[in-house]
Amino acid sequence: MAERSQNLQDLFLNTVRKSKNPLTIFLINGVKLTGVVTSFDNFCVLLRRDGHSQLVYKHAISTIMPSQPVQLFEAEEGSREG
């Protein structure tokens, strides 16, 4: 069965959503938001913190910085880390 192609943005957001890894989102206007991604679609990200949800439009996001490293791809057999 052919492996389904997934874009990097969706792969990243889905990984942090599943892991419930807290992250910081910086908006283009300089605002800093922190929380956990609970859902996302093509246009927005739902961020949860202290029992409250915030709907953040992707076009307003500058940077997403997870609090812990995110591994998006499995290491290939035989590969070594430097």
UniProtKB/Swiss-Prot annotation:
InterPro entries: Hfq (IPR005001), LSM_dom_sf (IPR010920), Sm (IPR047575). PROSITE patterns: SM. Disulfide bonds: none annotated. One of its GO terms (molecular function) is RNA binding. Pfam families: Hfq. GO terms for cellular component: cytosol. Residues 10-70 form the Sm domain. One of its GO terms (biological process) is regulation of translation, ncRNA-mediated. The keyword Hydrolase does not apply. Keywords: RNA-binding, Stress response. The keyword Kinase does not apply. Belongs to the Hfq family. PANTHER family: RNA-BINDING PROTEIN HFQ (PTHR34772:SF1). Homohexamer. RNA chaperone that binds small regulatory RNA (sRNAs) and mRNAs to facilitate mRNA translational regulation in response to envelope stress, environmental stress and changes in metabolite concentrations. Also binds with high specificity to tRNAs. This is RNA-binding protein Hfq. It comes from Chelativorans sp. (strain BNC1).
